[in-house]
Amino acid sequence: MANAVGRRSWAALRLCAAVILLDLAVCKGFVEDLNESFKDNRKDDIWLVDFYAPWCGHCKKLEPIWNEVGLEMKSIGSPVKVGKMDATSYSSIASEFGVRGYPTIKLLKGDLAYNYRGPRTKDDIIEFAHRVSGALIRPLPSQQMFDHVRKRHRVFFVYIGGESPLKEKYIDAASELIVYTYFFSASEDVVPEYVTLKEMPAVLVFKDDTYFVYDEYEDGDLSSWISRERFQNYLTMDGFLLYELGDTGKLVAIAVIDEKNTSLEHTRLKSIIQEVARDFRDHFHRDFQFGHMDGNDYINTLLMDELTVPTIVVLNTSNQQYFLLDRHIKDASDMVQFINSILDGTVPAQGGDSIFQRLKRIVFDAKSTIVSIFKSSPLMGCFLFGLPLGVISIMCYGIYTADTDGGYIEERYEVSKSEMENQEQIEESKEQESSSGGSLAPTVQEPKDVLEKKKD
């Protein structure tokens, strides 16, 4: 009986493994491996391509998601083909498309190449492909179509009117920013009745259950205005969003909380930020972005400081400055006063991108890297840092002892040289004495003895 149960369990496991392998094979079957022929054969189709490197860890994480993207695009009958290319093997093609890092996702449409900079999730990548592969400016022929778009998209832009210089600017902005948001065009009778326009033509953004009209005098360049307005007024923040918000020029007011903590203080600060974003939209939406962030890990890295949770911080992502609370925030009116104090300059900014802050950033990043390595793998940390330190220590010891031995040899050389000079001087003096003694011998007469005297 036990053997029979074991055999059935083993058969079930093998069946599950076979199903998983079959799913993987099916998913991979809808993602084409591209080679050098892709350069010449691609222009008749629209391609969504993942440029990867075999050794890249982020590329390996993206691979199963990319296979799901290929399967989904095929199942819905999308005209976009999904492929992947080893950018290290076909580096010339990757360079031609402007690949600078791995993985790089691009949608190739004719002679145009669009970079994907969003979250690496299946739904976000597929939405990007649909948005960019379609028409640059999509027409809204009826109010029913307008209502459908309104329900489907959280943020979208609409040009209302006929041919004009403003429409040309709108088309230019759309060609640059289509990777981020949707662009539509409509006639005045298609727009809902609650939309009031002072003049025509006009460009509007619909978001947060309301709309805003572009004013060239107050808002400046159209592309810059679209870049600022392409986000909802209140967002759940993460590192990617903060990076994207750096292009808007807006200050970002964030409630840093622990979403798992349901205490009053955490929910209160989040509610205050939401209330200010909603009720003071007309006052601050040009200059401020609002949201909350779960946890303080990313903020601590950005500020190079340890923030207590919960708290509120205002970031200037364009120059890395930040503002911390100078008062206790009781309600939305206190938060409004704090924001106004930032705008009028009475609250001092901290951080920045000065030379000192850059040096501080280098030291902080190095310290954080070392700490993270030792936390994740102490043995690896000891090997990575202990081995180089040991080699450097041995080299320093060798250099020091070499200098000492060299000094000793040099000193002995000097002593030997002086001894030789002394010896030469002694020998020279002896030679002089012997030579002087030989020259005096013939002139000195020895005393005669008695017999010699008698002979004389």
Swiss-Prot record:
SUPFAM superfamilies associated with the record: Thioredoxin-like
EC number, UniProt record: 5.3.4.1
Top-level EC class as recorded in UniProt: isomerase
Disulfide bond positions: C56-C59
Region of interest: Disordered: 416-456
Catalytic residues identified in the record: C56, C59
Catalytic activity, reaction form: Catalyzes the rearrangement of -S-S- bonds in proteins
Compartments in which it is found: Endoplasmic reticulum membrane
Residue intervals of the Thioredoxin domain: 30-131
Transmembrane region(s): 379-399
Renumbered ranges of motif Di-lysine motif: 453-456
Lumenal side, ranges: 30-378
Basic and acidic residues biased stretches: 446-456
GO MF annotations in UniProt: protein disulfide isomerase activity; protein-disulfide reductase activity
Glycosylation sites noted in the Swiss-Prot or TrEMBL record: N35, N261, N316
Signal peptide: 1-29
InterPro entries: PDI_TMX3, Thioredoxin-like_sf, Thioredoxin_CS, Thioredoxin_domain
Cytoplasmic domain ranges by topology: 400-456
GO cellular component, one term: cell surface
Sorted UniProt keywords: Disulfide bond, Endoplasmic reticulum, Glycoprotein, Isomerase, Membrane, Redox-active center, Signal, Transmembrane, Transmembrane helix
Domain comment (free text): The di-lysine motif confers endoplasmic reticulum localization for type I membrane proteins.
Protein task: Probable disulfide isomerase, which participates in the folding of proteins containing disulfide bonds. May act as a dithiol oxidase. Acts as a regulator of endoplasmic reticulum-mitochondria contact sites via its ability to regulate redox signals.
Homology family: Belongs to the protein disulfide isomerase family.
Name of the molecule in the record: Protein disulfide-isomerase TMX3
Organism of derivation: Mus musculus (Mouse)
Name of the coding gene: Tmx3
